[in-house]
């Protein structure tokens, strides 16, 4: 899978752009604040129907314009697919081969992307919400049912939290309705926990192998899912649902007192273990970065296994955050395998030696021009 063409209209600082890409490596060079990250964001939004940088869609629309339009042509092994996403005050409209999709969940998965930005190096040591988002966004691309279940869960969770607030402030007194919401939340929550455990087990297989290679056999990487549910390992979906229902009953008074849902996959976490030690607590910064890199690279192989297509890799100024050895491993792993978009003010000697015949684009205030050689930018 690769993105052949991209068209942008009124997306951030891009007024009207049409560009054709290489199926291999595309290097975006230019000074800061010229639009390199905006271009990567547009590809991410085309794939995921949401931004990784903002929850406010209006920020993606050029100032004083009514809407932004992103179009892309995706090459897949079974043929080409045309994608279109319109972002306006009324919301988003998504089309696949000119046919509008009723729900965005029906659209996501047409173009699979993996984004690796400097903040992703905090995947290991960041807040639990960072790791939950990582699981949900990456797994959601390869499992439409998981994405649908997640949407259902979040809708019921909002209802339940609202009702808990009403019980807390005595605006409501009917606990039977709370039990109904608890059962609905347990239905979708149990499926999410089960799928996450399954996903992490599959991802670990690739991540451990890559991490072992990077560390020259010195370290093994494992994932440990941490659930607010007391017993969850080795349980079926039905058993997980029953456990959730029972724990919601036990915690009812506490949840009413606090006015929020204290149990469920929205509060779960993942631990990264190196040789059976928690790297979040005991690992050096170098070990944490290597673990994050291993996890990101593992996604490539897992997506290939699940979808039979390699995803697109978006590297947003991440090479500057990695030393020479990690740069080498990253670039060797993706070479001649994954379409890659790489933003940088200028490439290191290591990167220039390893990247084979890249297509180079200079970004200057929302204008894109193709170049023939690397130039190091002065900041």
UniProtKB/Swiss-Prot annotation:
Domain of life: Bacteria
InterPro entries the record matches: DNA-binding_RecF, DNA-binding_RecF_CS, P-loop_NTPase, RecF/RecN/SMC_N, RecF_2
Gene3D superfamilies associated with the record: P-loop containing nucleotide triphosphate hydrolases, RecF/RecN/SMC, N-terminal domain
Annotated localization: Cytoplasm
UniProt entry keywords in alphabetical sequence: ATP-binding, Cytoplasm, DNA damage, DNA repair, DNA replication, DNA-binding, Nucleotide-binding, SOS response
GO molecular function: ATP binding; single-stranded DNA binding
Task performed by this protein: The RecF protein is involved in DNA metabolism; it is required for DNA replication and normal SOS inducibility. RecF binds preferentially to single-stranded, linear DNA. It also seems to bind ATP.
Record protein name field: DNA replication and repair protein RecF
Species of provenance: Ligilactobacillus salivarius (strain UCC118) (Lactobacillus salivarius)
